């Protein structure tokens, strides 16, 4: 019975190690690089700094928040 327990423990450990995805290269793990690729609304060319929002024609192009 102890051999079966040892075998079961080894199998469970191996399965647990292979089931965990190693996704260290995903953008969520590298926020600094993700922020370099992202254009924030404040730097968007159509952002209205006085009203602190984007005109409606700019909203489909990723400028947020929209002046409604």
UniProtKB/Swiss-Prot annotation:
MF GO annotations: ion channel inhibitor activity; toxin activity
Tissue expression as described in the entry: Expressed by the venom duct.
Q: Does the keyword Ribosomal protein apply?
A: no
Q: What cellular component GO annotations does this protein have?
A: extracellular region
> What highest taxon heads this organism's lineage?
Eukaryota
Keywords noted in UniProt: Amidation, Disulfide bond, Hydroxylation, Neurotoxin, Secreted, Signal, Toxin
For the modification Cysteine amide, which residues carry it? 67
Q: Which InterPro entries match?
A: Conotoxin (IPR004214)
Extent of the signal sequence: 1-19
Q: Which residues carry this modification: 4-hydroxyproline?
A: 55, 65
Which Pfam family, any one, appears in the UniProt record?
Conotoxin
Q: Its biological function? A: Intracranially injection into mice does not elicit symptoms.
Q: What remark about domains does the record contain?
A: The cysteine framework is III (CC-C-C-CC).
Annotated protein name in UniProt: Conotoxin mr3g
Q: Give the originating organism.
A: Conus marmoreus (Marble cone)
